Amino acid sequence: MPSTRKLFVTTALPYANGPFHLGHLMEYIQADIWVRFQRMQGHEVNFVGADDTHGAPIMIAAEKAGKTPQQFVADIAAGRKPYLDGFHLSFDNWHSTDAPENHELARQIYRDLRDRADGSLIERRSIEQFFDPGKSMFLPDRYIVGECPRCHAKEQYGDNCEQCGSVYAPAELIDPVSALSGAKPELRSSEHFFFKLSDPRCVEFLQRWTQDGKLQPEVANKVREWFGLRSNPDGSCSEGLDDWDISRDAPYFGIEIPDAPGKYFYVWLDAPVGYLAALKNLLEKRGQNYDAYMADPALEQYHFIGKDIVTFHTLFWPAMLHLSGRKTPDNVFVHGFLTINGEKMSKSRGTGLDPLKYLSLGMNAEWLRYYLATKLSARNEDMDLGTEDFMVRVNSDLIGKYVNIASRAAGFLTKRFAGRLTSDFGAAGLALLADLHGARDTIAQWYQAREFGKATREIMLLADKVNAYVDRNKPWELAKDAANGQALHQVCSVLINAFATLTRYLSPVLPALARAAQDFVGQDMQRWDAGGAVQAIAPYQHLMQRVTPEQLAALFQPPAAAQIAAAGAQEPGGLALAPGIGIDDFDRVDLRVALIVDCAAVAGSTKLLRLTLDIGEGRQRQVFSGIASACQPADLIGKHTVMVANLAPRRLKFGVSEGMVLAASHGDEKANPGIYLLAPGPGAKPGMRVR
């Protein structure tokens, strides 16, 4: 690896239908810490982001708001800066997928795919789609609802059932209706464009690319399953990858396909191209040549994403780039989902964290940056923000262990020694500082590997050593006797130098505090290898305050009843409430606590898991559930869930399903991704009825 590297780093593009939430910020902070560390190493980094602005949901939301789609996404973009600045996110550029650069690059990539290999990578096919005659538009699958043709659950989407996990074509839905108008849609034929992901050139490339270290092991293992058997809408099975429908029909807010009037790129084709467009826009503003930059063989390309969009970034995106003759990513770094106190974020229940409210309450952005860093690892794992844990970690680690090192020594140095430090550290002081300096490479390795939790733990262990030195030498006792002046000077000088070293190690996580500390100790905190002893300090200013219980209470205070009522008018969970039922109707559904005895992936399906359940009836049941995107089989074994025990068995192509487990998800999965398997409280036993 060259001593000076050239890196192009991105985060997933947020959909431009609302403000940032904590999940966005977690990803941006994760990437920002890594980027700041790379810059401290002297590497050249271009770190970019953009709004994902296209698609039917944007077009429909804009219409409801009485705006053009362009005005709607511009208004969303105007609200990004307070988040980016407030949480010290060091993006070099924030752009939009509706920008000219993205239109140009998306069309060029398409042309290159179309024109390579005798045009065999792009294929036109006539398909049947549902058309809303009232809206005069073809309906995306997510805007068609009806009865599942397999389990007969009501109000299921047009492509898969969230109750039984079945995958089907929209035309198979029973009694379909348009979610936009409530009208009965009509089946009409339309010519669509397909990228032939099943082409042997795609398959062979992706099998190599996804298994050569570019993905975390657990992600690579998941992707490997997708090259096996796949299920078709007609119930048959075939082997390999499905071709990808990359077009949508007008009216559509997006990028029109070259030489195909009225046809637009599907949003997931042009969205990742937005990474390149944001970079191109940045380089052009600097007077640099984009093509020359991307052609440099030394360039490294990295994407930070959530686990809900792995398919697009590990199959479609690298295949598009490779087969259009472009550089492919060096790594795709996947993270899990975030909960608060073990619950999915919800403003109405007081379990949401509004980032701007956090800042408006005077809460330090770097408290959150540090806390998330302590939880982040290189694995694709979910993480939880516990409010009590948050307060304890910030107050104990950052204030008690770290900042207090400087505050304990600064006053004595300023009052007794005019802020000057001695270079005589004594044997114990030299040994302590040597320990701190000796950890530099280990901490750097943890940062490089995105093991921020391990890096922060290592730093706090060093802080413990410094505080043990304080307790042994007791500078407050030394200060009581003028005869101890030399010893006091020595101890306080060691502490300030230790504080400077710890600050440099924490600088990727706490950039604002590091800048303030830089002014305090007179050392460069932006270079990892900066060294030398601190010569003098400026008068000490408070660097960080403690978190208070009152701040946390205000942050997580649920909205007033009137606000909750207003929010309810916007459809809770993204779906209108179902018609009311009587207690007799509910009593017919037998819900039981079930122990998950075993769980495994289903060959040929990317959505289903096969669960073996015990509800205490003397036998075990097999149930299929469409939760594979959110749950690892090994994590579920031994846990309890809730199942519908009296649902008639139904035969799927993978086997017979003898019930249904309960899971929750938002109506708009793109804006609010995640599937959450329900679990009973502690003490519940298999077979207990849920009433």
From Swiss-Prot:
Its cofactor is Zn(2+). It catalyses: tRNA(Met) + L-methionine + ATP = L-methionyl-tRNA(Met) + AMP + diphosphate. SUPFAM superfamilies: Anticodon-binding domain of a subclass of class I aminoacyl-tRNA synthetases, Methionyl-tRNA synthetase (MetRS), Zn-domain, Nucleic acid-binding proteins, Nucleotidylyl transferase. This is Methionine--tRNA ligase. The keyword Metal-binding applies. One of its GO terms (cellular component) is cytosol. It comes from Verminephrobacter eiseniae (strain EF01-2). Is required not only for elongation of protein synthesis but also for the initiation of all mRNA translation through initiator tRNA(fMet) aminoacylation. InterPro entries: aa-tRNA-synth_I_CS, Anticodon_Met, Met-tRNA-synth_bsu_C, Met-tRNA_ligase_1, Met-tRNA_synth, Methionyl/Leucyl_tRNA_Synth, MetRS_core, MetRS_Zn. ATP binds at residue 347.
